[in-house]
């Protein structure tokens, strides 16, 4: 999402992004990973990268309402008699870092596998239709607010961001899983992107 902000990404942009997440992370609404997997398969989006998914699916679908994709997700999923509700109370908070190029289907597959591992020892949960609902930043944030800030906003004062480390720590503490995506060493994008370095740093120091 950060690369969608017009112009060069600055530390202030990253701080704004972190603060936006911290303000909305406790939201109760999450998306079922199984419903998300079904959505991707139904619409043949397996080859879409995270970046493609945002630009081709999320932004167009939410353009009129200027809302999060999670707000509209239930309308785009077929509801069978045995289907898990596509939207429910959050069970896991997930924040993606540096996953713009890999297929989004791989991210979802990893979450589906995590759900299987969590419920593997609890057959009762599986039989009763229990599901993992994730608060996934790209799906549950209003990307129109995050990526297109008003240009007439007054500049933020320095003291407003002094609590940045505290806010970032709170965001990381809410995350229950971290997934590391390795980049091609011949083109190590992650090491040339300041915000990515910040995210990796916070993930490490908060372990």
Q: What does each model-found stretch correspond to?
A:
Residues 1-207:
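The feature represents the membrane-entry module of six-transmembrane cation channels
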């Amino acid at each position: 999402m950060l690369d969608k902000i017009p112009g060069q990404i600055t530390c202030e942009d990253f701080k704004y992004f972190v603060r936006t997440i911290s303000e909305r992370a406790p939201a109760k609404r999450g998306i079922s990973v199984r419903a998300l997997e079904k959505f991707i398969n139904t619409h043949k989006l397996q080859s879409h990268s995270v970046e493609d998914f945002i630009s081709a699916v999320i932004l167009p679908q939410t353009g009129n309402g200027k809302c999060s994709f999670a707000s509209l997700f239930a309308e785009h999923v077929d509801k069978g008699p045995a289907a898990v509700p596509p939207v429910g109370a959050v069970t896991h908070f997930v924040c993606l870092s540096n996953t713009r190029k890999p297929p989004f289907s791989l991210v979802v597959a990893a979450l589906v596998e995590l759900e299987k591992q969590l419920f593997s020892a609890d057959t009762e949960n599986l039989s009763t239709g229990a599901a993992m609902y994730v608060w996934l930043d790209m799906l549950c944030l209003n990307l129109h607010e995050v990526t297109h800030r008003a240009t007439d906003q007054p500049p933020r004062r320095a003291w407003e961001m002094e609590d940045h480390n505290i806010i970032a720590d709170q965001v990381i503490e809410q995350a229950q899983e971290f997934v590391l995506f390795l980049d091609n060493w011949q083109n190590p994008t992650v090491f040339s992107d300041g915000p990515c370095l910040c995210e990796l740093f916070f993930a490490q120091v908060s372990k």
